[in-house]
Regions:
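Fungal secretory targeting signals
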Residues: 1-20
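Beta-strand-rich interaction surfaces with strong enrichment in secreted/lumenal proteins
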Residues: 100-110, 134, 169-176, 213, ...
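Beta-strand acidic-aromatic groove motif in beta-rich domains, primarily in extracellular
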Residues: 128-136, 195-198
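Short tryptophan-centered beta-strand motifs in secreted/extracellular beta-sheet-rich domains
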Residues: 29, 118-120, 180-192, 199-201
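Short strand-turn-strand beta-turns centered on an Asx-Gly dipeptide
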Residues: 202-206
Length: 254
């Protein structure tokens, strides 16, 4: 270690200041090549989840997942199957759309010594049948789950934390319908009991809600950005193209 680096480390330690580490930089959507350094295509478990969209995307197919100019674009289009297939995931809805989902290669695990800040700017559809989200979910089992952004076919963003399937805290915040970009942030910090995680949610720099994840400390989480359709957002969904954009996304831990 260079002497000056050692001196800074000692100073930070004496002062009780923890260094910040960038997990996902704000330029991860600057190009496909950079995107592929930090993100994977589809869900961690495959192409299907609990809505009416089947995810499509790969290093050779960017018709539904694209990255450029620090912006991720997810696109959902109706399918034309006379007899639609069904999702392989519960509750096995009929597939009416092809769409896009990505998840971060780095998992997020809050510990007593590692808190996380997740930030991004979102242009989200709010029409009935559109179900975009920006969320954390357990790598093993379920819950934990925390939804930083979830739009379920209404002009609201839902901040959610699932402690069980029935013990859920939700805070709804009004969301504009003009597809303008607005920022969302979540700060995840371990509580002093060493088991629970405090989650502070903000929109456009204003604190909106504080929720608590029971037993979330030490649990590895996937970070997912998806454009799901119908399901909890109502039906029928749009008959044309739906676009969901995320820009300047950054994840840090201290």
């Amino acid at each position: 270690m260079h002497p000056s680096t050692f001196t800074l480390a000692v100073f930070l330690g004496v002062c009780g200041v923890r260094a910040q580490t960038t997990v996902i930089p704000s330029n991860s959507f600057s190009s496909i090549a950079t995107f592929e350094q930090y993100w994977n295509y589809l869900y961690p478990w495959g192409s299907d989840h609990n809505g009416a969209a089947r995810m499509v995307g790969s290093s050779s197919d960017h018709s539904h997942i694209n990255a450029a100019s620090n912006t991720l674009t997810l696109i959902a289009t109706p399918t034309s199957n006379a007899v639609p297939p069904t999702s392989t995931a519960n509750p096995h809805p009929a597939i009416h759309y092809a769409s896009g989902t990505v998840y971060a290669k780095s998992q997020i695990t809050v510990t007593a010594s590692a808190s996380y800040t997740l930030y991004g700017e979102f242009s989200s559809p709010t029409a009935v049948g559109t179900w975009p989200a920006f969320w954390l979910t357990a790598v093993a089992g379920w819950p934990p789950e925390t939804d930083i952004g979830e739009w379920k076919g209404t002009a609201n963003n839902w901040f959610n934390t699932f402690n069980t399937s029935s013990i859920v805290r939700s805070d709804l915040v009004a969301w504009p319908t003009d597809l303008s970009f607005h920022s969302l942030q979540a700060v995840l910090t371990a509580e002093s009991n060493g088991a629970d995680v405090r989650i502070d949610f903000s929109m456009d720099g204003v604190h909106k809600a504080t929720q608590y994840g029971a037993g979330f400390v030490g649990k590895a989480l996937w970070l997912i950005i998806d454009l799901q359709m119908e399901g909890s957002s109502g039906s029928p969904g749009p008959g044309g193209t739906t676009t969901y954009k995320v820009r300047n996304l950054k994840v840090t831990h201290t």
